[in-house]
């Protein structure tokens, strides 16, 4: 393999075809770090909006570190995988007391590459890939950046049948990426190979005959492009049943509480959870009635509601919402009450103030229904 020619072909393609993205227009490590955390589990189109939101509200390490976690979660609301937001906040609090994160890029380049990489990797939520991406994009250091797009390009380029999301696979692909890396132009090379995977070497039906790397692509030669990359078997999605009560007073106040423990949606707010119940054998059809307006229906969520004849009697909203490892079946029972019950660890809030708190996407759909009542 003529790596020099491959590098040139790839970079030439990138110069003509790349997208204009805000984090590519800067070498600010903070902004690049924010973008990389967002893009860990989020597509660029959705991530762009959140990048601008976060950078506008938290323009530097100090402002992010000094914020309350609740506010960080609120600005993250809707992106999912909320541990990313919590780790972002924890990392900022560590960074503000860490000398290396207050140096200019020029001053950082006086340090050893390994020092910069180690400092980055020591932060919560930052692994090898994210540390390598920041080191490369902010400081132009010779570290590979491995995301899903790069795994796909490498697996096809080398016709590699090792599952990239296993311990063995991660080690193997990192070695391939380090060997292929253009060490004279790591920032440009990493941007180019990521963009190739995002725009050209796509999961299905890629246009291999116009690919700049087709001369070297072993999967194309062996007719295995559509079989790659290989992933480890995904765990079975399990059903989980939840029930909540939404108390509403004549003054339009309700009760919410903050989730604790290490379960899903840690530190997000929700209505009073009656219990984690198995109501799959209930006559849920009695709760369904009319379908919610299309505006309230998400790609991975189906929603139904029923309105009973008397406003003092309960109403119920039934929703399903799919996470990566769980299918949630939730029922929100709306109870109009003269006054709120006393329930430990709950907060009394006005319905009009709910947008000041961070909720899961599932609960947000219930809130959207409430707003239309």
Label for each model-derived stretch:
Residues 1-19, 25, 198-373:
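Intrinsically disordered, low-complexity, charged terminal extensions of DNA damage-control enzymes
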Residues 2-4, 8-9, 13-209, 213-216, ...:
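Catalytic cores of DNA base-excision repair glycosylases
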């Amino acid at each position: 393999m003529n790596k020099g020619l491959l590098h040139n072909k790839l970079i030439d393609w990138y110069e003509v075809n790349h997208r204009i993205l805000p984090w590519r227009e800067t070498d600010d490590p903070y902004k690049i770090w924010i973008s990389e955390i967002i893009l860990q589990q989020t597509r660029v189109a959705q991530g762009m909006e959140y990048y601008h939101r976060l950078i506008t509200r938290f323009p530097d390490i100090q402002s992010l570190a000094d914020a309350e976690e609740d506010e960080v979660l609120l600005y993250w609301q809707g992106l999912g995988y909320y541990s990313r937001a919590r780790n972002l906040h924890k990392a900022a609090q560590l960074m503000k007391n860490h000398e290396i994160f207050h140096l200019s890029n020029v001053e950082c380049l006086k340090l050893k590459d390994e020092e910069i990489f180690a400092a980055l990797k020591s932060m919560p939520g930052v692994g090898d890939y994210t540390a390598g991406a920041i080191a490369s994009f902010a400081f132009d250091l010779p570290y590979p950046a491995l995301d899903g797009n790069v795994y796909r390009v490498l697996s096809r380029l080398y016709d590699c049948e090792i599952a990239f999301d296993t311990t063995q696979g991660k080690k193997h692909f990192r070695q391939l990426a380090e060997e292929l890396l253009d060490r004279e132009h790591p920032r440009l090379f990493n941007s180019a190979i990521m963009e190739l995977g995002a725009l050209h070497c796509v999961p299905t039906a890629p246009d291999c005959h116009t690919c700049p790397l087709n001369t070297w692509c072993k999967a194309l030669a062996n007719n295995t492009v559509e079989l790659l990359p290989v992933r480890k078997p995904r765990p079975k999605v399990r059903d989980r049943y939840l029930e909540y009560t939404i108390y509403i007073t004549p003054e339009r106040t309700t009760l919410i509480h903050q989730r604790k423990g290490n379960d899903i949606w840690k530190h997000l707010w929700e209505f009073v959870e009656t219990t984690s119940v198995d109501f799959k054998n209930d006559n849920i059809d009695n709760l369904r009635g009319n379908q919610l307006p299309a505006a309230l229906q998400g790609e991975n969520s189906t929603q139904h509601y029923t309105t009973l004849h008397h406003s003092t009697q309960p109403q119920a909203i039934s929703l399903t919402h799919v996470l990566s490892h769980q299918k949630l079946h939730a029922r929100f029972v709306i109870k109009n009450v003269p006054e709120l019950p006393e329930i430990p660890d709950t907060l009394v809030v006005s319905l009009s103030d709910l947008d000041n708190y961070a909720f899961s996407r599932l609960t947000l759909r219930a809130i959207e229904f409430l707003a239309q009542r």
